């Protein structure tokens, strides 16, 4: 009998070798056995349609199961699904949950949404707080980190211009 860790490793190996249907089956076994990473990957397979037809409802189900086990990436993926549906407030709420679990990319997205007034009232101070969270996060992609730095520089420059003209 193979261990749960073996199932996950075999699933990733199958995925890496282009055996999507085999990977899907293994991720499903791992997810049903309670492996959070397998839940997230299975959700992604259903979300994008890898090894199966895309099924956003099944993706949402698996992402929510992973989130209930504390997975920040799952909360972020749920937010993206809600964004795709045009459900802006729900997307904002789920990015907030993901950011609360330490996801710096979600903090950056919350800053951008706050500046644009999408999903919540426009707020530069709130955007600045989210940018600070993103910049202090250990869980942020390099691209998002660079974008957060650039956005913070832009906000700082805008504040300086406003204080000189005011």
Model-derived segments and spans:
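Short helix-capping/linker turns of helical repeat alpha-solenoids
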Residues: 2, 33-35, 48-50, 69-71, ...
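Hydrophobic face of amphipathic alpha-helices that form TPR/SEL1-like repeat modules
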Residues: 8-13, 41-48, 75-84, 109-116, ...
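Alpha-helical segment of the N-proximal tetratricopeptide repeat
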Residues: 3-33, 44-48
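Short coil/turn and helix-start
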Residues: 16-17, 32, 50-54, 68, ...
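Terminal, low-structured helical/coil segments at or just beyond the last alpha-helical repeat
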Residues: 130-166
């Amino acid at each position: 009998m193979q261990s749960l860790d073996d199932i996950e490793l075999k699933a990733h190996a199958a995925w890496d070798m282009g055996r999507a249907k085999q990977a899907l089956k293994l991720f499903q076994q791992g997810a049903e056995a309670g492996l959070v990473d397998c839940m997230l990957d299975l959700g992604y397979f259903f979300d994008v349609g890898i090894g199966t037809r895309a099924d956003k409802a099944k993706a949402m189900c698996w992402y929510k199961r992973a989130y209930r086990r504390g997975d920040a990436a799952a909360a972020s993926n749920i937010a993206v699904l809600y964004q795709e549906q045009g459900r802006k407030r729900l997307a904002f709420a789920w990015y907030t949950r993901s950011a609360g679990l330490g996801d710096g990319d979600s903090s950056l997205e919350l800053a951008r949404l706050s500046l644009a007034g999408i999903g919540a009232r426009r707020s530069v101070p709130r955007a600045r707080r989210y940018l600070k969270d993103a910049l202090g996060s250990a869980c942020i992609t390099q691209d998002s980190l660079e974008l957060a730095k650039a956005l913070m520089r832009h906000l700082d420059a805008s504040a300086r211009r406003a204080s000189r003209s005011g």
